[in-house]
């Protein structure tokens, strides 16, 4: 038994270089380190974990310095006390190991996609529309809100048979008077149809006049194809008591108080298009009324209760 224990201790002592350990540990700890190595079973196999992609290629053998995961050799170590029992100040900017050459920040054997990582679809829309229209990409990604209104599967009858496709109608807005409606189609999947509709909606952004930044100017009776819309302005705190499609459009446009009824056809697509057209074309602002009458109109509420 004594011979076996002696042989294992000799084998573990030969595994480490005492000169290397003495650089990082005092002599009082070297003996305990050597004794701790004897408790490791002989049949233990040290392998790299396969489940972790960004893992060092070793487990507990910290006597060797890895070229990527560790610091460069010769750097100061703070765990060993000096003769004066004072610790030196560790400056991270000076001791930090620089990145490997050629701008590669990943360990060997790991790669990323060609685009450098995953991008959101809204970022792709913003980048493309910035080149096409000059709209700020941050405005598209951060301030614009997108809501799908209609998503359905369409089947077209042709000479070759029935061809299925996907249709999407979405609305975008910044909740501050800007709103746009877009349509998209795709034969592959619904997500691509929504992507195209989002692209089209941002290009169709329009400004909606709002009274006190919360409701519409007066009442609107508007007809769009088979849809009849009756929209009424409301007092503060009234809320949105309208059709579910008109509700989503008002949320994106920043309209907070509105009452409305939909008569005749209840087609969601025509309701959405008719609502946008009613907001942009059927409203008459105070300036337009004053210009038509040839008189000066004053908003009494703003005159007496202006801030």
From Swiss-Prot:
Q: Does the keyword Oxidoreductase apply?
A: no
- Subcellular location, principal: mitochondrion
Q: What keywords were assigned to this record?
A: Mitochondrion, Ribonucleoprotein, Ribosomal protein, Transit peptide
Task: Tell me if Electron transport is a UniProt keyword of this record.
Answer: no
Q: Give the UniProt entry's GO cellular component terms.
A: mitochondrial inner membrane; mitochondrial small ribosomal subunit; mitochondrion
Q: Which PROSITE patterns match?
A: RIBOSOMAL_S5, S5_DSRBD
Q: Domain of life, per the record?
A: Eukaryota
Q: Where in the cell is it found?
A: Mitochondrion
> Which residues span the membrane?
none
Query: Which part of the chain is the S5 DRBM domain?
Result: 144-208
Transit peptide: which residues?
A: 1-13
- Pfam families in the record: Ribosomal_S5, Ribosomal_S5_C
Q: Gene3D superfamilies, per this entry?
A: 3.30.160.20, 3.30.230.10
Gene Ontology molecular function, alphabetical = RNA binding; structural constituent of ribosome
Show the InterPro entries listed in the entry.
Ribosomal_Su5_D2-typ_SF (IPR020568), Ribosomal_uS5 (IPR000851), Ribosomal_uS5_C (IPR005324), Ribosomal_uS5_N (IPR013810), Ribosomal_uS5_N_CS (IPR018192), Ribsml_uS5_D2-typ_fold_subgr (IPR014721)
* Entry similarity comment: Belongs to the universal ribosomal protein uS5 family.
Q: Cite the record's note on assembly.
A: Component of the mitochondrial small ribosomal subunit (mt-SSU). Mature yeast 74S mitochondrial ribosomes consist of a small (37S) and a large (54S) subunit. The 37S small subunit contains a 15S ribosomal RNA (15S mt-rRNA) and 34 different proteins. The 54S large subunit contains a 21S rRNA (21S mt-rRNA) and 46 different proteins. uS3m, uS4m and uS5m form the narrow entry site of the mRNA channel.
PANTHER family linked to this entry: MITOCHONDRIAL RIBOSOMAL PROTEIN S5
Beyond the main fields, what else does the record say?
Present with 6680 molecules/cell in log phase SD medium.
Q: What does this protein do?
A: Component of the mitochondrial ribosome (mitoribosome), a dedicated translation machinery responsible for the synthesis of mitochondrial genome-encoded proteins, including at least some of the essential transmembrane subunits of the mitochondrial respiratory chain. The mitoribosomes are attached to the mitochondrial inner membrane and translation products are cotranslationally integrated into the membrane.
Q: Please report the name of this protein according to its UniProt entry.
A: Small ribosomal subunit protein uS5m
Question: Which organism is this protein's natural source?
Answer: Saccharomyces cerevisiae (strain ATCC 204508 / S288c)
Give the gene that encodes this protein: MRPS5
């Amino acid at each position: 038994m004594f011979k076996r224990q002696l042989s294992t201790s000799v084998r573990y002592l030969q595994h480490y270089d005492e000169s290397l350990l003495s650089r990082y540990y005092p002599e009082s700890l070297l003996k305990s380190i050597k004794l701790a190595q004897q408790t490791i079973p002989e049949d233990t196999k040290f392998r790299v974990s396969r489940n972790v992609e960004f893992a060092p290629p070793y487990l507990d053998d910290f006597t060797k310095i890895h070229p990527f995961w560790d610091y460069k050799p010769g750097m100061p170590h703070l765990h060993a006390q000096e003769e004066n029992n004072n610790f030196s100040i560790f400056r991270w900017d000076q001791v930090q190991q620089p990145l490997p050459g050629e701008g590669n920040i990943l360990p060997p054997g790991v790669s990323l996609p060609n685009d450098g990582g995953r991008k959101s679809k809204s970022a792709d829309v913003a980048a493309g529309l910035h080149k096409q229209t000059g709209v700020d990409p941050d405005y598209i990604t951060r301030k614009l809100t997108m809501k799908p209104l209609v998503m359905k599967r369409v089947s077209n009858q042709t000479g070759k048979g029935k061809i299925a496709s996907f249709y999407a109608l979405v609305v975008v807005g910044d909740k501050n008077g800007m709103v746009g409606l877009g349509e998209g189609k795709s034969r592959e999947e619904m997500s691509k149809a929504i992507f195209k509709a989002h692209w089209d909606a941002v290009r169709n952004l329009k400004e909606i006049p709002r009274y006190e930044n919360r409701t519409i100017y007066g009442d609107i009776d508007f007809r769009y194809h088979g849809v009849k819309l009756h929209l009424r302005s409301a007092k503060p705190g009234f809320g949105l008591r309208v059709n579910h499609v008109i509700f989503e459009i008002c949320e994106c446009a920043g309209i907070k108080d509105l009452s409305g009824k939909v008569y005749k056809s209840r087609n969601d697509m025509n309701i959405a298009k008719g609502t946008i057209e009613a907001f942009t074309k059927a409203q008459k602002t105070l300036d337009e009324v004053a210009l038509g009458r040839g008189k000066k109109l004053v908003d009494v509420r703003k005159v007496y209760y202006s801030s």
